[in-house]
Amino acid sequence: MFRKSLARILFSGVALAMLSGIAAAEGIGASLLTQQHPFYISLAEAMKKQATTEGVALEVSIANQDLSKQLADVEDFITKGVDVIIISPVDSKGVRSAITKAQKAGIKVITVDVPANNIDVTSFVGTDNFAGGEKAGQLMATSIGDKGNVAVI
């Protein structure tokens, strides 16, 4: 349930970023990391629902954690002339060349959940996992009365 809510929140942020200054988008290509995880399944569903609501064409491709496939999918989006590419990178460094090529073609790029390293994008929508870990640690400490042992598996 939490993951579905998070996916909706993330996509709401993505939708807002897309609609800010590019409301006339004719097409969006989304390359997601996987569909083997409930988070990404929910994210894809939320994206499709929002695109339908906004009347925007959306093509979702699934990289299946394969960088070569993701790069080919992004290349396909560039060839099709989409206005926006949303990507959850398989490899934060490996997607740099594809993002650069998309940007040179005038396509806005938004990264979701996983940031791209060493390249600026239109927007990054994600969580602060470090802060989340700190909050989880604080909750565990409170739950055991600030003393005891905790194992993370």
Predicted regions and their residues:
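A residue-level marker of the well-folded mature domains of exported/periplasmic proteins
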Residues: 2-9, 18-153
